[in-house]
């Protein structure tokens, strides 16, 4: 079995709501604050207390901070994390969340990732929310996260660059490929930080899976509505393979260039397709052609059918709903002589069935060390199989 967490975002998600919910779930607030104070931050104090939100007792967070620097560069935050003594998985998860926000800001403002200067996200409270949340997840031993569809609210919000519609530009960019739930509330329900947590750490989105519930935590948002403005987190033991249905969309193409086909596949995957691939086939008149197969969530069927009709030369598509069974996924960080590598595990009843290092981490190490990719891959794989063993329970 593996410890997993379900984020029930019926009222949206924000960094402070998640951290509060994790403390309500059982994370130790004193230990979180102690770990955070190992970072070179201005003086601060965390205050967690219970508050009633429309009849629901939920945890809230207030941060007392004496801050001199509201705006930090992305490299400053990364260096602060890298130089710390935080656990490796906390470092990895924290940097991944900051990277997602930074990439979104870079795209919106038309600059490189290195040029991004964090505003709200660079402020102390957001740094505490992100890194503190990752510390809490580590305390609780959470390996895998799942999440409901996420509501954003609607209306307008005043941000650093002026008045913008909800969701804010960064939030909308981060939520690409994530299912959005409609909730008719004129207010911001999901922040960039909350969206980045979901984008970076959640394995899959949808209803609560078949599982044994262990603990439940409630984190309260700062706003008051006529409904409980809370994030509910549910810790459970994931015992079996995940079973669900997906949509398979196909078409045949005989008049597109390889460049155009490559562009479509990259675009579809960026938009949230679960998978896409091409198969060489022969069509009528003995023409060598290509069959496009795209796999997506059931609720994304209409969107990707339209994308295929819009972006390819095909005049039609075929769609089929199919059942699939997948192993439970979990991630751990492996420390190597070259740096840290994220390891993906496939679990069945808590036992390791598959394990492999993440390609992007290996690629980054190969580029940094200027060693052949295969050399790095083999070294990491050797250490991986010395550390973990197929058939053992993942601890």
UniProtKB/Swiss-Prot annotation:
InterPro entries: Ni_insertion. It comes from Staphylococcus epidermidis (strain ATCC 12228 / FDA PCI 1200). It is an enzyme of class 4 (lyase). This is Pyridinium-3,5-bisthiocarboxylic acid mononucleotide nickel insertion protein. Belongs to the LarC family. NCBIfam families: nickel pincer cofactor biosynthesis protein LarC. Coiled coil: none annotated. Involved in the biosynthesis of a nickel-pincer cofactor ((SCS)Ni(II) pincer complex). Binds Ni(2+), and functions in nickel delivery to pyridinium-3,5-bisthiocarboxylic acid mononucleotide (P2TMN), to form the mature cofactor. Is thus probably required for the activation of nickel-pincer cofactor-dependent enzymes. It comes from the Bacteria. Gene3D superfamilies: mk0293 like domain (3.10.20.300), Transcriptional regulatory protein pf0864 domain like (3.30.70.1380). Its EC number is 4.99.1.12. GO terms for biological process: protein maturation. It catalyses: Ni(II)-pyridinium-3,5-bisthiocarboxylate mononucleotide = pyridinium-3,5-bisthiocarboxylate mononucleotide + Ni(2+). GO terms for molecular function: lyase activity; nickel cation binding. Keywords: Lyase, Nickel. It holds the Pfam family Ni_insertion.
């Amino acid at each position: 079995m593996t410890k997993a967490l379900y984020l029930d975002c019926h009222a949206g998600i924000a960094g402070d709501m998640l951290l509060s919910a994790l403390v309500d779930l059982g994370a130790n607030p004193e230990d979180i604050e102690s770990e955070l104070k190992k970072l070179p931050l201005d003086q601060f104090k965390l205050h967690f207390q219970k508050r009633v939100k429309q009849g629901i007792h939920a945890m809230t967070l207030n941060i007392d901070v004496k801050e001199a620097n509201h705006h930090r560069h992305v490299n400053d935050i990364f260096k602060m994390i890298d130089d710390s003594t935080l656990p490796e998985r906390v470092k990895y998860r924290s940097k991944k969340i900051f990277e997602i926000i930074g990439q979104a800001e870079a795209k919106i403002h038309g600059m490189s990732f290195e040029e991004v200067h964090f505003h709200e996200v660079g402020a102390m409270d957001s740094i505490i929310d992100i890194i503190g949340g990752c510390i809490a997840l580590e305390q609780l031993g959470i390996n895998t996260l799942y999440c409901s569809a996420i509501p954003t609210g609607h209306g307008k919000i005043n941000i650093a660059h002026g008045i913008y519609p909800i969701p804010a530009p960064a939030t909308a960019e981060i939520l690409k490929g994530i299912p959005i739930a409609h909730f008719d509330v004129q207010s911001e329900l999901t922040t960039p930080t909350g969206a980045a947590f979901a984008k970076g750490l959640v394995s899959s989105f949808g209803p609560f899976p078949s599982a044994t519930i262990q603990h439940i935590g409630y984190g309260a948002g700062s706003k008051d509505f006529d409904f409980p403005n809370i994030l509910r987190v549910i810790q459970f033991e994931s015992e079996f393979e995940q079973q669900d249905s997906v949509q398979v969309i196909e078409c045949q193409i005989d008049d597109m260039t390889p460049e155009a086909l490559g562009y479509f596949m990259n675009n579809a995957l960026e938009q949230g397709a679960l998978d896409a691939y091409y198969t060489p086939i022969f069509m009528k008149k003995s023409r060598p052609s290509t069959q496009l197969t795209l796999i997506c969530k059931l609720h994304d069927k209409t969107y990707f059918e339209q994308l295929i009709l819009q972006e390819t030369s095909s005049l039609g598509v075929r769609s089929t709903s199919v059942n699939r069974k997948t192993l439970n996924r979990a991630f751990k960080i492996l420390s190597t002589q070259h740096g840290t590598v994220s390891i993906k595990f496939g679990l069945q009843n808590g036992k390791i069935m598959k394990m492999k290092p993440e390609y992007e981490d290996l690629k980054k190490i190969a580029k940094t060390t200027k060693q052949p990719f295969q050399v790095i891959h083999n070294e990491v794989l050797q250490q991986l199989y010395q550390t973990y063993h197929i058939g053992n329970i993942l601890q």
